[in-house]
Curated annotation (Swiss-Prot):
Belongs to the aromatic acid exporter ArAE (TC 2.A.85) family. GO terms for cellular component: plasma membrane. The lineage of its organism: Bacteria, Pseudomonadati, Pseudomonadota, Gammaproteobacteria, Enterobacterales. This is p-hydroxybenzoic acid efflux pump subunit AaeB. The keyword Transmembrane helix applies. The gene is aaeB. It is found in: Cell inner membrane. Its main location: membrane. Forms an efflux pump with AaeA. Could function as a metabolic relief valve, allowing to eliminate certain compounds when they accumulate to high levels in the cell. It comes from Enterobacter cloacae subsp. cloacae (strain ATCC 13047 / DSM 30054 / NBRC 13535 / NCTC 10005 / WDCM 00083 / NCDC 279-56). Keywords: Cell inner membrane, Cell membrane, Membrane, Transmembrane, Transmembrane helix, Transport.
């Protein structure tokens, strides 16, 4: 799409962004706020951020959720700033350095929490730094400054939310309904591929695509939950559908793997049933009814366990899907499905990556402090703030370098655009509030169009331009002050980008190895006779880690197959009829301890030693299963697991 083109679907959000900025400006001046610029800047960032991420108008609830995160982050940052000032007001240099460490700590935390919640911690880090830097000349005004910042940011967020509600926000419900129908058809087609036992590359492409779509549906569920409380019932059902969809993928892929060694396990009856093509959800529903009749006639024992489980999961999917689309009262049958299992959350595999982010942010802020003190530049503080903002917000995203470049382009574009407004437009509007609002609305409208196109530098240009304009009360026009602010932003972004480029993040290989070992640990831990452990649902957490693996190593099919095999082993062993006795229970605990040692080992040598010990213990465990006459439903998945661990031993132990 060209830089000068305006698509019709982009106009509504551009008007919404302009309205949010104008409303924040009007309220700020009407109530005689000290710095209305903060309210305007907050309204712009809260409204434009989700649009840039979505590549279009954000769905209903996204702006409100981002606003709530900004309020939480601001309050945490203000409390931290006041605490640091109270404890270290007599040592200004130490106070600033501790603030740099606080910014790094918040970046570390934001790297470990869910991506959608990381914004609050990133904001908490640089908010404290902004307050500490701003009150250097008058430290006794810190409480007043913190209260003013909180109140003006809340006003900006309220204005953004009001503008969002005024222009009928887009509901994601119809997208959810369409995706639910399309997803079950794709699930059926994956099962057809697996039963045909065709090309492995085609199967890999199909299941990895379904993992991404299931993850995307979970993101839609979060948006729907933010949209309105009336979707609470749909939200509960969609949570369960996430697990059901992942179960369908797992059972289909296990069907494919079983046929590698035992192609006769899938009977001709089911091959014929799955041979019929399906195009719509009605076709899937019709086929499932036929399969349930066949299963009822032939009996569960004569039905392959993966197909039996798959048909049951697909039936539950259709039941829950119907409830989501109609948003009806939850029936007794649905309630039984919804209360089935306790979902376990995934443990972060990016601790080393988080520590790299901590050092990047801390070093960048300290470098800014040294630059400020060494040069004595009046806008060194502005450069420091930009360093903190760029590093705090960039680190959690997949490509921090591109975020830094986006900010750098934005600050470069803000220099001529800001100069036009500062020297020509704003001085001409001093006698009319209406003209001032119109002038800013025009700028917001056109930048809002570019933000939705995800134009590089557009979001940074919007924030940087508003930041250097004199939207204070009263407005004063000193060109030297404007130039200092603009250059301070530019230098800050450049220094932040240099730190991101120089402090390399070599944690990718380590993260990949940790993820794979987490899959191994989950598979080993599923060997248990404890009823409570068996009821724990690890599937969403395991697929969340698989999704991270897909993003970290795109195209590495061997890793994906290994991870998927571990997930299949986990699911099969979790439901396997393991003989119940004290001997096996004690050995299960020993296996879990050894798997935990592999996961937490601090060096490659220790990891290899513990992994070798785990393989030896698994050989002993297989012998114990033979002694206790365990059925094939137990011995076969254990043998498959041991074979995979032997085959990929180097990948699982070496960095």
């Amino acid at each position: 799409m060209g830089i000068f083109t305006i698509a019709s679907q982009h106009i509504r959000f551009a008007v919404k962004l302009a309205s949010a900025i104008v409303l924040a400006l009007f309220v700020g001046f009407h109530f005689q706020l000290e710095t209305p610029r903060w309210a305007v800047l907050t309204a712009a960032i809260v409204a434009a951020g989700p649009a840039f991420a979505a590549g279009g108008e954000p769905y209903s609830g996204a702006i409100r959720y981002r606003g709530m995160l900004r309020i939480i982050g601001t309050f945490i940052g203000c409390i931290a700033a006041l605490t640091i000032i109270i404890l270290m007001i007599r040592t200004p240099l130490l106070m600033v350095l501790v603030c740099c460490i606080w910014a790094g700590f918040c970046t570390w935390l934001s790297s470990l929490v869910k991506v959608e919640n990381s914004y609050a911690w990133g904001l908490a880090g640089y908010t404290a730094l902004i307050i500490v830097i701003t009150i250097q000349t008058e430290p006794l005004l810190a409480p007043q400054f913190a209260v003013e910042r909180c109140s003006e940011i809340v006003i900006g967020i309220v204005c953004a939310i009001v503008a969002d509600l005024l222009f009928s926000p887009r509901s994601i419900k119809q997208e959810v309904d369409r995706e639910l129908d399309a997803l079950i058809v794709s699930q059926y087609q994956l099962m057809q591929l697996c039963i045909k036992h065709g090309d492995s590359e085609e199967v890999d492409k199909a299941w990895s695509g379904l993992v991404r779509r299931t993850q995307a549906l979970e993101g839609m569920r979060s948006n729907l939950n933010m949209e309105s409380s009336r979707w609470a019932r749909a939200n509960r059902r969609l949570k369960a559908i996430n697990t059901v969809s992942l179960t369908l993928i797992t059972q289909a892929c296990e069907t494919y793997l079983i046929q590698n060694t035992r192609p006769e396990s899938v009977t001709d009856t089911f091959r014929e049933l799955f041979a019929e093509p399906v195009e719509t959800v009605q076709d899937v529903h019709k086929q499932l009814k036929r399969m349930r009749r066949v299963i009822a006639w032939t009996g569960e024992r004569d039905t392959p366990v993966t197909i039996y489980t798959w048909v049951g999961a697909a039936t539950r999917y259709l039941l829950l899907k119907r409830g989501v689309i109609g948003n009806t009262k939850i029936s007794a049958a649905e309630e039984e499905v919804l209360q089935g299992e306790v979902v376990i959350k995934a443990e972060s595999a990016e601790r080393h990556h988080a520590m790299v982010n901590f050092w990047r942010t801390t070093l960048a802020c300290m470098l800014g402090t040294l630059f400020w003190l060494w040069t004595g530049w009046t806008s060194g503080s502005g450069a420091m703030v930009m360093i903190a903002v760029v590093t705090a917000l960039a680190m959690r995203l997949p490509n921090p370098r591109m975020v830094a470049i986006d900010f750098l382009y934005g600050t470069i574009a803000a220099l001529p655009l800001g100069a036009l407004y500062f020297l020509v437009i704003l001085p001409s509007t001093q006698q009319s509030m209406l003209l001032l609002c119109i002038s800013l609305a025009v700028m917001a409208f056109f930048i809002g169009i570019e933000v939705q196109k995800r134009r590089l530098g557009s979001l940074g240009a919007l924030a940087s331009t508003i930041n250097i304009l004199v939207l204070d009360n009263p407005m004063t026009f000193h060109f030297s002050q404007f130039l200092d602010s603009a250059l301070g932003q530019l230098v800050g972004c450049f220094l932040a980008m240099m730190v991101i480029l120089l402090v390399r993040d070599n944690s990718q290989a380590r993260t990949g190895r940790v993820l794979l070992n987490q899959f191994v640990s989950a598979a080993v831990s599923s060997m248990t006779t404890n009823t409570a452990r068996r009821k724990e649902n690890h599937l969403p957490a395991l697929y969340q880690q698989l999704f991270l693996l897909l993003n970290k190593f795109p195209g590495d099919i061997a890793r994906f197959r290994l991870a998927l095999t571990m997930i299949i082993a986990h699911q099969r062993l979790r439901n396997a009829p393991v003989p119940i006795n004290d001997d096996l229970s004690a050995f299960h605990r020993q296996l879990r301890r050894t798997a935990d040692h592999v996961l937490s080992a601090s060096s490659d040598d220790k990891r290899r030693r513990y992994f070798k010990q785990l393989l030896e213990e698994l050989d002993v465990y297989q012998e114990k299963l033979r002694v206790w006459e365990a059925p094939p439903q137990v011995t076969e998945p254990v043998a498959r697991l041991v074979f995979m661990l032997h085959r990929y031993q180097n990948v699982l132990t070496d960095n």
